[in-house]
A protein has these predicted regions:
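Glycine-rich phosphate-binding P-loop
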Residues: 1-18
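Feature primarily recognizes SF3-like P-loop helicase cores of small DNA viruses
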Residues: 18-45, 51-59, 63-65, 69-173
Length: 173
């Protein structure tokens, strides 16, 4: 259903790390997911299916969000290993609930989009043109928030963290 999920993902990517690679299909293999996460500061996966996010994939996504390493056997060797650092943002969209495992759920910000129908439905081109007009203002607000946080971060006190991303929660407060 048309709800603007893919367009919203493109806008997030544009704000954080504009580059040639746009939204990607979710990789079928864990190794391909690791390579994608290791090579981008933000990986945007479009039209994901919850069926692809099993235990192994969930663990990799947790490591990427929190920071971690993926170690595997080096090609053409029996005992040598390759260690790949994982630290980056992940954005995924899909029609069903994509995450179920509690450790990943605690690292996720989930947004639910309503369907867009009729006259409210816009072309991607028009939507992106409008976004480009307001993008400098959005970035200005983001930078202002970061600046305020950096000035006052030592004064921010939280007695009860409700998510694992404690630094994110500190900034949000």
């Amino acid at each position: 259903h048309a709800s603007g999920k893919s367009s919203a993902c493109t806008m997030i990517q544009e704000l954080i790390s504009p580059r040639c690679v746009d939204r990607m299909a979710f990789p079928k293999k864990v190794d391909d997911l690791v390579i994608s996460l290791a090579n981008h500061c933000i990986s945007v996966f479009d039209n994901c299916s919850a069926r692809r996010i099993g235990e192994d994939v969930s663990d990799i996504l947790c490591q990427s969000v929190s920071g971690g390493f993926y170690t595997k056997r080096k090609l053409y060797s029996d005992m040598d290993t390759v260690t790949i650092p994982l630290k980056g943002m992940v954005v995924m969209n899909g029609c069903d609930s994509l995450v179920e495992r509690p450790d990943l759920v605690s690292r996720v910000l989930q947004f639910n989009f309503s369907s867009i129908e009729g006259e409210r439905l816009e072309t991607d081109q028009k939507l992106m043109e409008e976004f480009q007009k307001v993008k400098p203002k959005i970035l200005g607000v983001i930078f202002e928030i970061i600046s305020c946080y950096l000035e006052e971060k030592d004064d921010v006190k939280i007695d009860n963290y409700v998510i694992r991303l404690t630094e994110f929660q500190r900034v949000a407060v």
